[in-house]
Design a protein with these regions (language model features):
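Residues within well-ordered alpha-helices
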Residues: 94-95, 105, 178, 202, ...
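Conserved beta-strand -> loop -> alpha-helix junction used to position metal-binding or nucleic-acid-contacting
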Residues: 242-252
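Phosphate-handling DNA/RNA-contact segment within nucleic-acid enzymes
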Residues: 117-211, 226
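Conserved catalytic cores of soluble enzyme domains
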Residues: 8, 35-37, 44, 164-167, ...
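Alpha-helical scaffold elements adjacent to nucleotide-binding pockets in ATP/GTP-utilizing enzyme cores
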Residues: 30, 228-232, 249
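TOPRIM metal-binding catalytic domain and adjacent DNA-binding surface shared by DnaG-type primases
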Residues: 1-32, 43-135, 156, 161-167, ...
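Short phosphate-binding/catalytic loops that engage adenosine nucleotides
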Residues: 186-188, 237-238, 245, 258
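Short, surface-exposed amphipathic charged segments that create phosphate/polyanion-binding patches used
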Residues: 205-209, 251-264
Length: 285
C-alpha cells in the first residue's frame, strides 16, 4: 500500500484530525489516535503506534496487507580474484589470436590484463574504478559479441600509477580495443570508457588537474559522448582536447597504418576546449 498523510483539507476519516494519520487510495486508514471506530474494522495493530482500519462493509474476505518479500542479500564479488583466475587461464596462443584479430601486439593486451573464460569461450577485460580496483569483467566472445559478467559494475579499461607525474596527457578512448591500440602505439597513459557515455563519475575523479585528450569514435554517438564528457570535465581538468580520428575509431586508424607520430600530430593540431561553445563546435565530419 502507498500511504498518504492526512491534512486540513482531507482529515483522518476516523478521528477527524489533520495530522499524524495516513490513508490509502483503496480506502485503508491508519489512525494514530483511535483503537476502535464504528463502521471500521481493525486489521493491524502497529508496534510503533496506530491501528490500520478497513471499512466494515467491505468484502467479507479478510483484507490482508500485500506481502512484500525481503530483497535478496547483495552478493559481494571478489573481482580481483576472479580477474587473476581469468588472466591465468589465458594461454599465450589465445592472447596472440586475439591480438592478430584486433591488429595490435600481444604486449598491449597483456597490459590491459586480458584473460580467458573457458566455459563461455570468451576473452575477458577487467574494468577498474579510479583507485585501480577491479569492479567488473567485460566479455568478448569469438563472434565479437560483447557483454559483462553478472554483477559487474561499469569501470575503465586500463589503469596506470596515478602517483607518477608526467607531462604527457591522459588519453581517454571508447572501449577496450581502442585502448589496446593506443597502448600499442606507445601512449601508456590511456584508459577506455565502457561506452560512449559511461564512467563519467570515475573519470572526474581520476582526471582532476590533469591534461586530457578524449579520443572520440568518428560516428555521431561517439562524438556526442565525447562532448558530453568534455562538458563534465571543464573546470576539473587542467587542459582538455577532443580528437576525432580520420577513420571510424583509433584502432581502425592504427590498423590502416597510423603511427604514434600521426596521432601525436593530430593531437597537437587540435584546438584546446576552453568553454562550452568550443565543445559544441566539434563534429564527426
Amino acid at each position: 500500500m502507498s500511504w498518504v498523510r492526512v491534512n486540513k483539507n482531507k482529515p483522518c476519516p476516523i478521528c477527524g484530525k489533520p495530522d499524524w494519520c495516513s490513508v490509502t487510495v483503496d480506502g485503508a486508514c491508519r489512525c494514530m489516535r483511535v483503537q476502535e471506530a464504528p463502521g471500521w474494522k481493525a486489521i493491524k495493530q502497529h508496534v510503533d503506534g496506530g491501528v490500520t482500519f478497513r471499512p466494515a462493509n467491505e468484502d467479507t474476505n479478510e483484507y490482508k496487507e500485500r506481502y512484500r518479500p525481503k530483497p535478496p542479500p547483495v552478493r559481494l564479488y571478489d573481482w580481483r580474484n576472479i580477474q587473476d583466475e581469468l588472466y591465468q587461464a589465458s594461454e599465450a596462443a589465445t592472447r596472440k589470436q586475439l591480438a592478430e584479430e584486433l591488429g595490435v601486439r600481444v604486449i598491449a593486451l597483456t597490459a590491459l590484463g586480458v584473460g580467458w573464460h573457458e566455459k563461455k569461450e570468451a576473452h575477458t577485460f577487467p574494468m577498474y574504478h579510479e583507485q585501480g580496483v577491479v569492479v567488473g569483467i567485460r566479455m568478448r566472445s569469438r563472434s565479437g559479441k560483447k557483454y559483462a559478467l553478472p554483477g559487474s559494475k561499469d569501470g575503465l579499461f586500463g589503469i596506470f600509477d596515478m602517483s607518477y607525474k608526467s607531462t604527457d596527457p591522459i588519453l581517454v578512448a571508447e572501449g577496450p580495443t581502442d585502448v589496446a591500440a593506443l597502448l600499442d602505439l606507445g601512449f601508456h597513459f590511456s584508459v577506455g570508457r565502457p561506452s560512449c557515455r559511461g564512467a563519467v563519475g570515475i573519470l572526474k575523479k581520476l582526471l582532476k588537474c590533469r591534461d586530457v585528450v578524449i579520443i572520440s569514435d568518428a560516428d555521431g554517438p561517439g562524438v556526442d559522448g565525447a562532448k558530453s564528457l568534455a562538458h563534465s570535465l571543464i573546470g576539473i581538468v587542467n587542459r582538455l582536447k577532443i580528437v576525432v580520428p580520420p577513420e571510424n575509431d583509433v584502432r581502425e586508424w592504427r590498423n590502416k597504418g597510423a603511427t604514434r607520430d600521426d596521432v601525436q600530430l593530430l593531437i597537437s593540431n587540435t584546438q584546446e576546449c576552453k568553454d562550452a561553445g568550443q565543445i559544441q563546435s566539434i563534429t564527426s565530419e
